[in-house]
Amino acid sequence: MEKLNSKYFFEPFAEPEISFRIKDDIDISKAPYSMDNIKNLLDGILCSIEIVDFRFNKPLADIGAINLVSTNGASDYWIYNDKIYNIDEIDLTDFEVSFFIDNKLQEKGNTNNVLENPLNAVLWLINTLCKKGEPMLKNQFISSGSCTKAYRLNTGTRIKADFGKLGLIEFEYI
């Protein structure tokens, strides 16, 4: 089981997410892409946990969501399963993800918590980057957004996200 050392984090939270791998370099001249062709750009899906860490010296409420996102001020670490699944392996509009702390169920989340379908987040990101002239490249990953609320990590806890047939992500925060 992976161990994350608390000395490298300030105020971390864990978010279970469905992630995607890019199949080939994306041709920006073919943008904008749509839900009809987005799957053709993707090699597969995998389960992951993003560790967000707030490194500001004032409370999150004083920073504001726009400032936080615009500075990429929360993304810090990404844990992922090595197994890549076919994108049609699950129903992305309704797939349950269970989140545990010390083997106690905290929440049964769902992929529909990510803009109703994680592919909507992927589509937005790819089209936004294409507009800026920044293509995504083969084998890059996209983490689509949390299926549950974010959970604070406390030293000495064990974290597990159960993605059903896509597998488990587990780690200990020491």
Where does each model-flagged region fall?
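Short, well-ordered amphipathic alpha-helical segments that serve as non-catalytic structural scaffolds
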Residues: 121-128
